[in-house]
Amino acid sequence: MTDNQRQSTTDGQPETRDPAQATAEAAEQTQATQASAAVEGELQDGSADSATGASLSADDGADPEALRQRVEELEKALADAEQKAEEHWDQVLRMRAELENARRRAEKDVDQAKRQGLEKVCGDLLQVKDSLEMGVQAAEDAEADREKLLEGSQLTLKMLNQVFERFEIEEINPQGERFNPDYHEAMAAQPSDEQEPNTVLQVVQKGYRLQDRLLRPALVVVAKKGDGGAGSGGSVDETA
């Protein structure tokens, strides 16, 4: 600053500045501020990059050997699971084959049992047939003894009853019994003052059952409430 300028300031007059100089000083100050901000930003970016790099280094360097072992463990577990699945599938296939074989054996055994049972029945009936043929031949003789023919027929019937007994074939002869629609079939109903209604008065044809299975129902005539006259017909209580 010149002596005249100092004098002016001393005298209380405002200092006058060159506009160009003021503009230059302002530009220098702005550049200095921008440079300072740029340096500070670079420092901050460098710190962030350093932190990120350190984090990545920590992740990337998180014991590669442990990661490799973990991968090997997972691969081994997967291989074991696949092996077990294959073993289980083989077991399923074997069990399926065994069940199919068992089913076939059971069917074969049932068929064989049926054939054996039928063969046994037929074998026993052959003896009855032989006896009947002998009786027929004896009856054809004009000089045949009637009593001997009767004895032969009775013997044949006895043989047949023995066959039925061996195979648990039971005769149904419900004479005088109460009508049972499960084992009897009513052919007619007759009035009766001596028997209660639905009582079997006559067995037209005997029935037979094999154990608990009905082979043939007995054909019967049942009693109904007397109406003062004889005759046939009328209804039967099928629910008796």
From Swiss-Prot:
This is Protein GrpE. It is found in: Cytoplasm. Homodimer. Belongs to the GrpE family. Residues 1-89 are annotated as: Disordered. Residues 20-38 have a biased composition (Low complexity). Residues 1-13 have a biased composition (Polar residues). Keywords: Chaperone, Cytoplasm, Stress response. Pfam families: GrpE. The gene is grpE. It comes from the Bacteria. One of its GO terms (cellular component) is cytosol. Residues 65-89 have a biased composition (Basic and acidic residues). One of its GO terms (molecular function) is adenyl-nucleotide exchange factor activity. One of its GO terms (biological process) is protein folding. Participates actively in the response to hyperosmotic and heat shock by preventing the aggregation of stress-denatured proteins, in association with DnaK and GrpE. It is the nucleotide exchange factor for DnaK and may function as a thermosensor. Unfolded proteins bind initially to DnaJ; upon interaction with the DnaJ-bound protein, DnaK hydrolyzes its bound ATP, resulting in the formation of a stable complex. GrpE releases ADP from DnaK; ATP binding to DnaK triggers the release of the substrate protein, thus completing the reaction cycle. NCBIfam families: PRK14139.1 (NF010737), PRK14150.1 (NF010748). Its main location: cytoplasm.
